[in-house]
A protein has these predicted regions:
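Classical eukaryotic N-terminal signal peptides for Sec-dependent ER targeting/secretion
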Residues: 1-44, 52-55
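Exposed, interaction-prone regions of secreted/extracellular proteins
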Residues: 31-442
Length: 442
């Protein structure tokens, strides 16, 4: 337990980089508009400054200083546009979503994954054998995303990819590490910290995991914080050789520019140092379906004392080829992480975690009010607190079995907590989450 708690407190910063300044009272839309106009002004000034510099003495430090920042901005914009050319591939069809996203239907063999030298010129693998014990009988409704509610779909032979915009990259603290987690995180869990409420299993060999995750729209109070709920499949030590495969939903204003819960994936093979990324923002994950867009908003979402909705995620290792596959919802194979991406996960996982995480930047010196899950404590139960249900793992024989010896941990229980249980219908489950700042969590 102590080793996991220490890991959680020093884990590489999850799903959003934290900045030291906060703009809680400024709307994200206003920030984007003002910043966009500012950049246009900078470009104009740079042209004027460049012309002016030809008639100014080289010894004039004031004139030199005036042209320095515009040149830096121009270089940054050039770098952004070059990165966008790598990420955004030519589309055969484009779909506009009601949430402002643009979904590009990209030929399957031209998606970002195939820029990788070991995949270049290849095509996606055929679907693998499903784990024994898998059944679609409990899938009661068709999971959906906002973009698909338009009635439009991508044609056969293509995959839907959320288009990355210039504004997406301008929100990032580092253009070169856009779409990645930072390599170093402060160990002080009370400042710029990551707080968790998770269930986990360890001590065996794990070849996959499955769960239904309740979907909510928790409040995220700062652009530089996030709230997520996900599955982690982990291998290696919690140092430089950490391997992880991650999938779930997240609200991440910095990464996406809004507060919609979005389906996401992540991977790393070196503890988030130089490998891995979110979604399809680098060469790695290979998408194989035309119905689910990674990074797109999930619909519907749950409401307090109202309708409850969840997404079913299954991650498992193909015993024939060794790739790690991801299934979303009602039997939709999203794609796979190729085996060669990893070191330890080429064999198996050594730990599986399920649960929630938030970033706490301590605005104004107090705990954040960013919510986890539904924003309500676990004790409120169904319809009020968020849940994970039907927790399962995949064993060495490619068989889905119920999770056993599930341990639960909340590292800040006065802010976010967790309560586990079992039932005939839900199997192993837990409720988790909380409001963040409150009288017991100042």
């Amino acid at each position: 337990m102590l080793s996991l708690l220490n890991h959680l407190r020093r884990r590489k910063q999850h799903h959003i980089r934290c900045f030291h300044h906060h703009h809680n009272r400024v709307s994200f839309k206003s920030v984007k508009m003002v910043f966009s106009r500012f950049l246009r002004l900078i470009l104009l000034l740079s042209l004027v400054s460049s012309s002016f510099s030809y008639t100014t003495s080289p010894s004039n430090s004031t004139a030199s200083d005036q042209t320095l920042r515009p040149q830096e901005e121009i270089q940054k914009l050039k770098l952004i546009r070059n990165e966008l050319l790598k990420i955004n591939k030519p589309a055969v069809k484009t779909i506009q979503s009601s949430d402002g996203d643009t979904i590009d239907c990209v030929p399957t063999h031209q998606q970002p994954a195939f820029d990788h030298p070991l995949l270049h010129g290849q095509r996606p693998m055929d679907p693998p054998e499903m784990p024994k014990g898998y059944s679609k009988d409990d899938e009661s409704y068709e999971d959906s995303q906002l973009w698909s509610l338009t009635g439009e779909s991508c044609p056969e032979g293509t995959v839907p990819i959320r288009r990355t915009t210039e504004q997406d990259m301008l929100r990032a603290s580092s253009v070169r590490r856009f779409g990645r987690k930072i390599r170093r995180v402060r160990r002080d869990s009370t400042s710029n910290g990551h707080e968790h409420a998770v269930g986990y299993v360890s001590g065996r060999q794990y070849y996959g995991a499955k769960a239904s995750i309740n979907v909510w729209s928790p409040i995220v109070t700062s652009q530089y914080e996030f709230s997520l709920s996900q599955i982690w499949v982990i291998a290696g030590s919690f140092t430089h050789d950490l391997n992880t495969i991650e999938a779930g939903w997240q609200i991440s204003p910095e990464l996406y520019g809004d507060t919609y819960p979005r389906f996401f994936t992540y991977w790393t093979s070196d503890a988030y140092r130089t490998t891995g990324c979110y979604n399809l923002l680098c060469s790695g994950f290979v998408q194989t379906n035309r119905r689910i867009a990674i990074g797109a908003a999930i619909s519907p979402r749950s409401s307090y004392k109202g309708g409850q909705f969840d997404i079913r995620l299954l991650i498992w290792k193909d015993p024939k080829h060794g790739h790690w596959w991801l299934q979303f919802g009602s039997g939709v194979l999203v794609g796979y992480w190729p085996a060669f991406l990893f070191t330890h996960l080429r064999q198996h996982g050594s730990m599986v975690q399920f649960g929630g995480e938030i970033v706490n930047t301590r605005p104004g010196g107090s705990h954040t009010s960013t919510q986890m899950g539904s924003g309500h404590f676990a004790g409120e139960g169904f319809g009020k607190a968020s849940y994970f249900r039907n927790l399962q793992m995949v064993d060495w024989d490619n068989t889905l079995i119920p999770v056993s010896n599930l341990k639960i941990l909340a590292d800040h229980p006065n802010c976010y907590d967790i309560r586990g249980g079992t039932s005939r219908v839900w199997g192993n489950y837990f409720y988790y989450g909380g409001p963040g700042k409150n009288p017991r969590c100042p």
